[in-house]
């Protein structure tokens, strides 16, 4: 029994960690989940946002000065979009646990991102997108990808 307990603790980091996508792999996954031209934003915009938000890492978590945190490949914020159980006054507009956004399966992140971008601010909700992708040629982010 002790052996299995130790084995479980050793394997937990492997099970719990997310995934770091390759650029074209992420582009294909995002396209499969319907982000290509979603709300008028090309696939290049989504891949660019993911690069600068999380470096394509689904397990990324970053704390903000206001006490909220950003989660997952698109760094979805706990103040507005998900519930992390510790952000006071959180709205949880995606009606999802923030931990669900850390999965190697990006379905939850994409579904919540669709909700975020449907808001009046669109992709302006993502600071990294505003700073690195908005108004720029983002075709480089899908160049050479079979999407």
Curated annotation (Swiss-Prot):
Keywords, comma-separated and alphabetical: Antimicrobial, Bacteriolytic enzyme, Disulfide bond, Glycosidase, Hydrolase, Secreted, Signal
The protein's Enzyme Commission number: 3.2.1.17
Catalytic function, reaction form: Hydrolysis of (1->4)-beta-linkages between N-acetylmuramic acid and N-acetyl-D-glucosamine residues in a peptidoglycan and between N-acetyl-D-glucosamine residues in chitodextrins
Active site, renumbered: 53, 70
Tissue: Expressed in liver and ovary. Not expressed in bone marrow, lung, spleen, intestine or oviduct.
Disulphide connectivity of cysteines: 24-145, 48-133, 82-98, 94-112
Annotated binding of substrate, by residue: 119
GO biological process: defense response to Gram-negative bacterium; defense response to Gram-positive bacterium; killing of cells of another organism
Molecular functions (GO terms): lysozyme activity
Short name of any one Pfam family annotated for the protein: Lys
Keyword Signal on entry: yes
Broadest EC class assigned to this enzyme: hydrolase
Protein name listed in UniProt: Lysozyme C
UniProt source species: Dromaius novaehollandiae
């Amino acid at each position: 029994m002790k052996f299995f307990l130790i084995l479980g603790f050793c394997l937990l980091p492997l099970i719990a960690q997310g995934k770091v996508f390759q650029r074209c792999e992420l582009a294909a996954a995002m396209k499969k989940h319907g982000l290509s031209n979603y709300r008028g934003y090309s696939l290049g915009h989504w891949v660019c946002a993911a690069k600068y938000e999380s470096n394509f890492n689904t397990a990324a978590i970053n704390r903000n000065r206001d006490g909220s945190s950003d989660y997952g490949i698109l760094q979805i914020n706990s103040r507005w979009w998900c519930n992390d159980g510790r952000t006071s006054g959180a709205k949880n507009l995606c009606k999802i646990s923030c931990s669900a956004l850390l999965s190697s399966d990006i379905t939850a992140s994409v579904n919540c991102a669709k909700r975020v971008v449907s808001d009046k601010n669109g992709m302006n909700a993502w600071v990294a997108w505003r700073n690195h992708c908005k108004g720029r040629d983002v075709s480089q982010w899908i160049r050479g990808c079979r999407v």
